[in-house]
Design a protein with these regions (language model features):
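Residue-level detector of conserved catalytic or cofactor/ligand-binding positions
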Residues: 209-216
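Metal-cofactor-binding active-site regions of metalloenzymes
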Residues: 1-207
């Protein structure tokens, strides 16, 4: 619960220690290209740079839309969960804004079966937003397919997956359905079951959901 200035001040204290790290160069590249500031950020210059940036950010040309126009951005793709409403994508399009803002499909939480309570909570939200009653694995896939179709209608053509390790376990449909029932019922899965479920979901996203939606368009 700190102020914006306090956060910026701490970053200014940290920047000198990032020398030879990309963070050092990125920080000063952004200050120079976006704000025209050539000063080195450190504790001594922090307040001056902070005030100058904020003064410029109050101007229309430094708004989010103004900055995108300056850099000739044509398309912005956001990272979105299947249960996201995409309401701001719709509002932006309806406002007549010339730069396209499109969603991307990021279904990590639909694969996150490590904590049964969290997974069940997510599936319940998925059921609510999709209008599909979910009581088994096939129901969940139907709900995800419905959401994927909605994303496609809003211009989504890209998928983004946060894969922290490689997995391509062999599995059967019966195993995956049983694993879903187990975790949805509140029982923790084994490491092998987790990997099998994630492997199955990647295949399903690529073959049964993504490819089908693209083919229909």
């Amino acid at each position: 619960d700190t102020t914006d200035w306090e956060k910026f001040e701490k970053w200014a204290e940290t920047v000198p220690y990032t020398f030879r790290n990309p963070l050092y160069h990125w920080t000063h590249l952004e200050l120079k290209t976006a704000f025209g500031i050539n000063k080195i950020l450190n504790p001594q210059t922090a307040r001056e740079i902070y005030d100058e940036c904020n003064e410029k950010l109050s101007q229309p040309e430094y708004s989010a839309r103004g900055m995108m126009r300056r850099y000739h951005v044509e398309v912005v793709c956001t990272t979105d969960d299947p249960i996201d409403s995409l309401e701001y994508h719709i509002k932006t399009r309806e406002s007549g804004f010339e730069i396209k803002m499109l969603p991307t499909w990021r279904p990590d939480k639909a694969m996150a079966v490590e904590v049964p309570a969290d997974f069940r909570s997510y599936v319940e939200k998925l059921a609510e937003v999709s209008g599909v009653t979910i009581s088994n694995f096939d129901d969940m896939i139907a709900a995800l397919r419905k959401r994927h179709d909605f994303f496609a209608e809003q211009g989504c053509r890209l998928s983004d997956h946060g894969i922290e390790e490689f997995y391509a376990e062999d599995y059967t449909d019966a195993e995956i359905k049983a694993i879903f029932n187990k975790v949805y019922g509140g029982t923790e899965l084994t490491k092998e079951e987790i990997l099998k479920f994630k492997s199955a979901m990647l295949v399903i996203f690529g073959e049964k959901i993504g490819r089908a939606s693209c083919r229909e368009r």
